[in-house]
Structures are given as C-alpha cells and as structure tokens.
Regions:
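Catalytic strand-loop segment that frames the active site of acyl-thioester-processing enzymes
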Residues: 1-32
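A generic structural signal for short beta-strands and their flanking turns/coil linkers
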Residues: 7-9, 58-62, 74-78, 88-90, ...
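Generic structural detector for well-ordered beta-strands
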Residues: 10-16, 65, 111-113
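Residues at secondary-structure transition points
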Residues: 28-36, 71, 102
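Hydrophobic beta-strand-centered segment that forms part of the acyl-chain substrate-binding groove
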Residues: 45-77
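HotDog/MaoC-like acyl-thioester-processing domains
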Residues: 71-72, 82-127
Length: 127
C-alpha cells in the first residue's frame, strides 16, 4: 500500500433526510448530523488510502469540528489530505465544504488518523 504526504481525495455527497441529526438520533433538527459528516470525512480518508488484498486501513482517532448546519439537499464536498505518516499511522487533515450563495463555505474541519493493518491479522482479533 503506497501512501504519500500531500496525497488527497475528495468525496461529494448530498444531504438526504436519512442523514439528518433527527434521523440518526444525534439531535432533533433536520440538518446534517455530525455522525454522518464524520462518516463522509472518513470516506475521503479511505479514498486516499485504497486497499490491497492483504492490507487495509482502520480508523483510530477522530477530532473534527462541525462548524455550520447544512440543510437537506445541500451538496457537501469532503476532502482528506495526508499530513503525516509515522510508520503504519497515517494522519489526515480533513475539511468539508458546502456550496452556498456561489461560495464554498467551510462547514467542518479536523484531523483523522488511520492505521495500516494486515487484513487477516486484524480480523483474527475478533476470535
């Protein structure tokens, strides 16, 4: 698995009713739920890493600030960029932006760390 500093990926999602805080139980408003935003940011980190038949990455740490609400129907772009590689630990700078009034508005930012693991060895820990 080859991952390099500065490598990045962006995933684009549209907020659905099922993505709201009300729907996922993280609040009582029909706006993008923080757990969904976190999942989308993690998806961007996974897009950077990819995987092989023998290796993949798993999330180990998340520190994200959810800065602004987003309505159902909003288009959200989530970007992850490799900021640090320390042995098998890969740290990403992440951010989420929403197109609003012809501007890209920052709605979330933070840091996510993933560990490179051997698939079989990791899954053996379930036994």
């Amino acid at each position: 698995m080859e991952i390099s500093l500065g490598q990045s990926a962006t995933v684009v999602r549209h907020v659905a009713e099922t993505d709201t805080a009300l729907a996922v139980g993280s609040g009582d408003l029909a706006v993008l739920g923080t757990p969904i935003l976190l999942a989308w940011l993690e998806a961007a980190t996974v897009a950077v890493c990819g995987s092989t038949d023998t290796q993949t990455t798993v999330g180990t740490r998340v520190a994200v600030d959810h800065l602004r609400p987003s309505a159902v129907g909003a288009e959200i772009s989530c970007t992850a960029e490799v900021a640090e590689i320390d042995d098998r630990m890969v740290t990403f700078k992440v951010e989420a932006r929403q197109r609003h009034n012809d501007q890209d508005v920052l709605i979330g930012r933070g840091v996510i760390t993933r560990a490179i693991v051997a698939r079989e060895r990791f899954l053996a820990k379930l036994d």
